[in-house]
Amino acid sequence: EVYGSIESGSFREEDNLLPSSPYSASKCGGDRLAYSYFKTYDLPVIITRASNNFGAFQYPEKLIPLFVTNAIDNLKLPVYGNGLNVRDWLYVDDHCDAINFLIKKGKLGEVYNIGGNNEFSNLDITYRILDQLNKSRKLIEFVDDRKGHDLRYSLDCSKIHELGWSPKNSFDNALKKSIQWYFQNKSWWGPIKSGDFKKYYKNQYKI
């Protein structure tokens, strides 16, 4: 998100940071603050910029856990705009593995993109979730797009690949494992989606 949106190609670490929303700007600020401590105080810092994560224990406001848990409960899946916003998806286990790899082999003060090379539109992700759960696509409900919603994120991860890291999990297998986890752990996410979460959900999606 710190790079902003890109129509074609992929962002490299040296590209300008052009966040489109206060949320992404806060990430950009944290990125640069960490670097400033490296430059000023020689604090051992390595900066990583990762694509969209997914996996077990992800808070259910995020797209994949929200849509999986809604589908399990036969609730509507609120898709922003036309659903064609594209994201690159990175399984959380691979993200953790990449961070551990960079702690050992990364260069202090450097920036590394971490992506899964799994670019899909939000609508594609929605279809995959519904298909894996054998749920009807009639559960999809298109809602007004959110403000500052970037169209496409894409990362060039050549830098970390050249060091020797690449993701181990295929997207389809990782999504299957994630869906299975949420299916088996309603005792964790069920209470989270009650109470204040319902108020947030209604205000966010107007459904």
Task: Explain the meaning of each model-derived region.
Residues G29, L33, Y37, F67, ...:
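Hydrophobic alpha-helix immediately C-terminal to the catalytic Tyr-X-X-X-Lys motif of short-chain
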Residues E1-I47, N52-F54, Q58-P60:
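Catalytic helix-loop patch of NAD(P)-dependent Rossmann-fold dehydrogenases
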Residues P65, A71-I207:
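C-terminal substrate-binding subdomain of Rossmann-fold SDR/epimerase-dehydratase oxidoreductases
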